[in-house]
């Protein structure tokens, strides 16, 4: 789909009408810090939140609420005639909407899908509300920590992929004539979160999605650094116990599936 790239000084009809249209029929992806923030806001554990409000193993919010006039189900965290029940902890996707964010060559760009401003479909009344610059909108939505978390988790996923490549290239697996590992990587890259969740052992899913780390909502960096350290140590312990080419193959597939997840 075509996207429209934006500059930070561009003024758009970004004042929310609080109609709740964007809280219905969408897909909201979560990283582990966002899940922990939401659970903290609900005063439940991350594991409990994952079961109650997520699908695809905890990587996506469950839209299983009442349907709107378009027949689209509400997010499970949406309350009719009130709005988001966890608004102060809402994830980056919700803070940015209707904008999106993409990072290329270590530079972030803000976009919206298509060529027509998304809110005009379902919330045309925003045209009667004050326009806001993209920069002011981002500041008002307090996206900075959530953008930091998004970028940090992309790096963590790359670290897991690097472990997978190390297992393939530095253990003799590739030289042994193995082709199954690359085949499984390609297949795994085509799977959705639900399908990947079914292939990941429970202890690895929990280590990745709901780590037992205390959250301080004002210190995202410490949470993510602790999470990365735990994943690296768990991966190293796992790798240290391997001996056969089949062991290396299975571990390389596991690490790449973790990266895709």
Task: Set out the residue ranges of the language-model regions.
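Short loop/turn segments that flank or connect secondary-structure elements
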Residues: 1-21, 28-36, 40-261
């Amino acid at each position: 789909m075509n996207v429209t790239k934006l500059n930070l000084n561009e003024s758009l009809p970004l004042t929310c009408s609080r109609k709740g249209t964007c809280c219905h029929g969408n897909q909201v992806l979560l990283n582990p810090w966002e899940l922990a923030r939401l659970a903290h806001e609900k005063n439940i554990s991350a594991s409990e939140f994952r079961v109650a409000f997520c699908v695809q193993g905890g990587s996506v919010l469950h839209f299983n609420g009442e349907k709107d006039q378009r027949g689209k189900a509400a997010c499970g965290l949406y309350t009719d005639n009130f709005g988001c029940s966890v608004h102060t902890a809402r994830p980056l996707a919700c803070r940015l909407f209707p904008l999106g964010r993409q990072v290329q060559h270590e530079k972030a760009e803000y976009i919206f899908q298509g060529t027509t401003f998304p809110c005009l479909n379902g919330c045309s009344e925003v045209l009667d509300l004050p326009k806001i610059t993209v920069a002011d909108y981002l500041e008002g939505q307090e996206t900075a920590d959530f953008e930091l978390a998004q970028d940090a988790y992309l790096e963590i996923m790359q670290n897991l992929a690097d472990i997978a490549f190390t297992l393939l290239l530095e253990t003799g697996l590739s030289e042994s004539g193995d082709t199954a590992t690359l085949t499984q990587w390609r297949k795994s890259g085509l799977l959705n979160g639900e399908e990947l969740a079914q292939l990941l052992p429970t202890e690895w899913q929990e280590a990745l999605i709901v780590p037992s780390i205390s959250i301080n909502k004002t210190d995202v960096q410490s949470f993510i650094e602790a999470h990365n350290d735990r994943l690296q140590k768990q991966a190293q312990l796992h790798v240290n116990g391997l001996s056969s080419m089949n062991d290396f193959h299975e571990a390389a597939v596991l690490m790449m599936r973790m990266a895709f997840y």
